[in-house]
Swiss-Prot record:
<keyword id="KW-0574">Periplasm</keyword>
<dbReference type="GO" id="GO:0042597">
    <property type="term" value="C:periplasmic space"/>
</dbReference>
<feature type="binding site">
    <location>
        <position position="181"/>
    </location>
    <ligand>
        <name>Mo-molybdopterin</name>
    </ligand>
</feature>
<dbReference type="GO" id="GO:0046872">
    <property type="term" value="F:metal ion binding"/>
</dbReference>
<protein>
    <recommendedName>
        <fullName>Protein-methionine-sulfoxide reductase catalytic subunit MsrP</fullName>
        <ecNumber>1.8.5.-</ecNumber>
    </recommendedName>
</protein>
<comment type="subunit">
    <text>Heterodimer of a catalytic subunit (MsrP) and a heme-binding subunit (MsrQ).</text>
</comment>
<dbReference type="GO" id="GO:0043546">
    <property type="term" value="F:molybdopterin cofactor binding"/>
</dbReference>
<dbReference type="InterPro" id="IPR022867">
    <property type="entry name" value="MsrP"/>
</dbReference>
<feature type="signal peptide" description="Tat-type signal">
    <location>
        <begin position="1"/>
        <end position="44"/>
    </location>
</feature>
<dbReference type="InterPro" id="IPR036374">
    <property type="entry name" value="OxRdtase_Mopterin-bd_sf"/>
</dbReference>
<feature type="binding site">
    <location>
        <position position="238"/>
    </location>
    <ligand>
        <name>Mo-molybdopterin</name>
    </ligand>
</feature>
<feature type="binding site">
    <location>
        <begin position="91"/>
        <end position="92"/>
    </location>
    <ligand>
        <name>Mo-molybdopterin</name>
    </ligand>
</feature>
<comment type="function">
    <text>Part of the MsrPQ system that repairs oxidized periplasmic proteins containing methionine sulfoxide residues (Met-O), using respiratory chain electrons. Thus protects these proteins from oxidative-stress damage caused by reactive species of oxygen and chlorine generated by the host defense mechanisms. MsrPQ is essential for the maintenance of envelope integrity under bleach stress, rescuing a wide series of structurally unrelated periplasmic proteins from methionine oxidation, including the primary periplasmic chaperone SurA and the lipoprotein Pal.</text>
</comment>
<keyword id="KW-0500">Molybdenum</keyword>
<keyword id="KW-0479">Metal-binding</keyword>
<feature type="binding site">
    <location>
        <begin position="249"/>
        <end position="251"/>
    </location>
    <ligand>
        <name>Mo-molybdopterin</name>
    </ligand>
</feature>
<feature type="binding site">
    <location>
        <position position="233"/>
    </location>
    <ligand>
        <name>Mo-molybdopterin</name>
    </ligand>
</feature>
Length: 334
């Protein structure tokens, strides 16, 4: 795997930044916050995050054993851990960036069951311990780009999805992979209340083409900053597809199903003109209500240090993934 030329270790989103808000912006859902433009709301959240000293501390997750393959290390500046764990989108726990950190402690992640089914020869069921022990774990420093035009650099820990799928032996009929988040309204207030959860239909679902799922970059993620994922970041296991917008990174996964047909995805169902199935990071294809040409990188500095930078095609991973979409109109298939 070629070392990513766009990432330097100094670019990684610091540990304190990675972990917190995204408001509901879909006019079709009839939620009052939907009138807000996502970038404006997201930047307001950035201001509230940086202006005070009341940021929640980075959670103390269980330390993990993992390797650091050279191919996945780089010199990008990391987003601090407290920002990674305190500034994020997980509508099942509320719309504000700080809501997941404040409310996700109610999520019970052990015991846990992850089922792999559908067009496979050998259906599998993994428990909580399997997620960190069945496959060798490795740290990968990835860029993360939100559709709201902000970004981070994060040292995720996990294993390639293709290793898990290989155990299940996809059949020749398998063309897509469908993912589903846990449905637990008693633990997730956004699944109980339409207003709290942004008017989305739950459980949250996502999907990839099989070749995307099998790509070496696609990561089943169980940790960050050397420790197990905190609940607000999608514990105990989430998906990271670094060349796609962050909403493709489904959290707290309980089901992976291989299918013949393209599966439904939550944001595409909610607003098909705004959120496509592919959701590849593309500076040349704007969201209908804001530009995707630039992004705000969340690093270790304060609000005055947050700078706009050019958005990279496929989030800087074009050398690795552009061939997946050869001949595909990226404007039509956004």
């Amino acid at each position: 795997m070629k070392k990513n030329q766009f990432l330097k270790e100094s670019d990684v989103t610091a540990e304190s930044v990675f972990f917190m808000k995204r408001r509901q912006v879909l006019k079709a859902l009839g939620i009052s916050a939907a009138a807000l433009s996502l970038p404006h709301a997201a930047h307001a959240d950035l201001l509230s995050w940086f202006k005070g000293n009341d940021r929640p501390p980075a959670p103390a997750g269980k330390p993990l054993e993992f390797s650091k393959p050279a191919a996945w290390q780089n010199d990008l500046p990391l987003t601090p851990a407290d920002k990674v764990s305190g500034y994020n989108n997980f509508y099942e726990f509320g719309l504000d960036k700080a809501d997941p950190a404040a409310n996700a402690g109610s999520l019970k992640t052990d015991p846990w069951t992850l089922k792999i089914s559908g067009e496979v020869a050998k259906p599998l069921t993994l428990d909580h311990d399997d997620l960190t022990r069945r496959f060798p774990l490795e740290e990968r420093i990835y860029r993360m780009r939100c559709v709201e035009a902000w970004s981070m650099v994060v040292p995720w820990i996990g294993f390639p999805l293709h290793k898990l799928l290989a155990l299940a032996e996809p059949t020749s009929n398998a063309k897509y992979v469908a993912f589903e988040t846990i449905y637990a309204p008693e633990q997730m207030p956004g699944q109980q209340d339409r207003f709290i959860g942004g008017g989305l239909k739950y459980p949250y679902v996502e999907g990839l083409r099989l070749d995307e799922a099998m790509h070496p970059l696609t990561l089943m993620t169980v940790g960050v900053y050397g420790k197990a994922l905190p609940p607000q970041n999608g514990a105990p296991v989430r998906l990271i597809v670094p060349w796609k917008y962050g909403f493709k990174g489904i959290k707290s996964i309980v089901s992976i199903k291989l299918t013949r047909e393209c599966p439904p995805t939550t944001w595409n169902l909610a607003a098909p003109d705004e959120y496509g199935f592919y959701a590849n990071v593309n500076p040349h294809v704007d969201h209908p209500r804001w530009s995707q040409a630039t992004e705000r990188f969340i690093g270790s500095g304060g609000i005055l240090d947050v700078q706009r930078q050019p958005t990279l095609l496929f989030n800087g991973y074009a050398d690795q993934v552009a061939s997946l979409y050869r001949g595909l109109d990226l404007r039509e298939n956004f």
